[in-house]
Amino acid sequence: MKLFIWVQHLFGLGHARRMARIAGACGADGMDVSVAAGGPDGADIFRGLTNVSAHQLPPLRTSDAAYSGLLTDEGAAPDEAYWATRRDALLARLRAVQPDILLIELFPFGRRKFASEVLALIEAAKALPTRPLIACSVRDIVEPKEDPKKTAEMAGWLKAHFGAVLVHGDETVLPLTATAPFAGDVGVPLHYTGYVAPDAPSATTKAGVVVSAGSGASGEALVNVAIAVAKDHALPARPWHIFVPPHLDPPASSGPNVHIHPFSPDFTSYLAGAEVSVGEAGYNTTVEALALGARPVLVPYVEAGQTEQPTRAKAFAKAGRAAYLPAKDLNPMMLLSTVEAARSLPPATSLNLSGAKHASLILKGLRRDSVPS
């Protein structure tokens, strides 16, 4: 069974990493997986996965965190010729693969600026000698659109072109229809895969609290408050490990039992040994903490008008899976009390964190059901 994936990351690598876990699970499950990656160095994220080949499209990225524009690697806005080159490469790859399943990441729930490209891909897929199952892959939360015309157009695309939506979340924690009500109104089945989490690495260090921060102003504030708390409250049995983004230059040491690190791939091995994880409420940050056994304290990113992270933090807190600290309330006393509250949270043993494997099973089942016997 052949699977073709379209994925486009714009700001950070979260979307591509989640799709790499899904592609890897599908490949390990015996599918022949081809990926068309449109973000900078996107194809590299898929290298080395079993039965997965990745093709790099001419890359595009966002100009800022508000997704106000697109830029090429040279920092220029893409012109018609650039878009045509991307489209031609994408469609040539699709026709070479002749997939049984076409999996499109996020669209039509997002990536609106890529509508012409994705719709051309869909029409080309429909014109193949054997029409593939066309499915959407979407995370647990969709940023709502204020313009009802845009919402109606998204609903129209979903109804007209897609046979299924794979939702990488848990309906009991937060249904997709909470942030995209139209998804429940157009007759396209929603299949909840569970959360797409990484395999757990071995813990190399016993860490009481692990703090990770993003690159924006909110990340800098979180690092500074965490250092202020840790220098007075870290204990030998409960050290604090604070991982900072490259642009910050915190003190090399802030007291005994406090360890400050540049962000690195070793982060997850520390997280695997942590009792509590303090970080923003992005999809991967939240799910990795739960999968690795740490109790999450979620301090969501709220810059650039984003609602995704506060929505996720509130939902996980309501479900008893995380402690929620709004960014506006972030100070040393509140962070300390929230960390202490998180210690009493139950482990995530009953939460479905095998979303990549379940996505593969769902896709194979849907394809089998769609082929006339």
Predicted regions and their residues:
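A short, glycine/small-residue-rich beta-strand->loop->alpha-helix junction that serves as a flexible
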Residues: 7-20, 219-220
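Conserved nucleotide-sugar phosphate-binding/catalytic loop shared by glycosyltransferases and other
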Residues: 3, 27-81
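Donor-nucleotide binding loops and adjacent catalytic segments primarily
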Residues: 23, 180, 195-276, 310, ...
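Conserved nucleotide-sugar donor-interacting segment of glycosyltransferase catalytic cores
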Residues: 91-159
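Nucleotide-activated donor-dependent transferases that construct or modify glycoconjugates
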Residues: 1-12, 104-106
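A nucleotide-sugar donor-handling region in carbohydrate enzymes
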Residues: 137-220, 243-248
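C-terminal amphipathic helix plus adjacent low-complexity
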Residues: 336-373
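A donor-sugar binding/catalytic signature common to diverse glycosyltransferases
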Residues: 267-311
